[in-house]
């Protein structure tokens, strides 16, 4: 046993894939579970679908504020291990305080504040990984994404079972424990993170270069692609727990399990699709994922008319899994477009995804308020728009 543990430690020292994937899992565990907590919060506070969508949107918008500053620090701070370690305590303590929120607006504010800590992790960790393995950016981002996607699988399942025996506030107290425990582990792991050979303080010229890159036609098209892609993913995912609970009458435990399985596919597809896009090009992989997800989304109202619940769950699983699966390819395409300042570029891309992309939850909540199946039609329309943009922009392999 001691030899096995020593071997794991040595392997972790050689590669940051596992510790960073573990860190991603721990940091995302609570934020990914909020969507399953939402029906219980709505029941206690008397929220309608539109207000649930607004809560999820504000949660993501607040989180998005942490991405870009973190990206800047990823490119300029010498010792990034300490910053990574601090994110766990920010997230854990932040959501603990949020569990005591008395009303909707205080809860939305505290969720957003806690989410900033989770957001800060992403540009820091991903910048370190793509700088360490520049020839396999898609694969590196995919391995990092496994942890986050697994948290979106395991978190909702655990939350679903916990909600069967306690309220959402007590549930929140339990699910912050993995974050705090990994925060303790990172007191040691932070020492494994290589320091940057030299400080690369971002200058006025760097900002001008980034501004010039992103305001060109190609840059603007990529911005629209990233935003619409993530809006379609958020629109598809945000209403699924409420849809299964309220419309189909499934229990919290079954809802959490079904939602977890829907993103399990994406957990294992991200490194595979990322590596595949490293070999055959970003566009082919992204087009395949978005096109298939669009078909799945448009099929939900049809299947609903026939009362085929199991088929609905299968189509949602495929749609969510493939949209999650191409995330690393989309991020790698953004890094390759600018060609430098990986942390800043990734921070900008994450801001677009969780900032502008967060409006997918608000729009889906509005559509679901009319009829639940309309939320999935909206996701299909957003996928179609993303598909058009993908054919309009040149993506390097």
Residue ranges of model-derived segments:
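Juxtamembrane intracellular "pre-TM" segments in multi-pass secondary transporters
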Residues: 1-11, 193-222
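Extracytoplasmic gate region of multi-pass secondary transporters
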Residues: 34-35, 218-264
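Conserved MFS/SLC helix-loop-helix module at the cytosolic interface between two early adjacent transmembrane helices
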Residues: 65-102, 277-280
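Cytoplasmic helix-loop-helix junction between adjacent transmembrane helices
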Residues: 110-148
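Intracellular juxtamembrane helix-capping segments at the cytosolic ends
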Residues: 120-133, 324-338
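Helix-loop-helix hairpin linking two adjacent transmembrane segments in secondary transporters
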Residues: 144-191
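C-terminal transmembrane helical hairpin of 12-TM major facilitator-type secondary transporters
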Residues: 283-330
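A late C-terminal transmembrane helix in Major Facilitator Superfamily
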Residues: 340-370
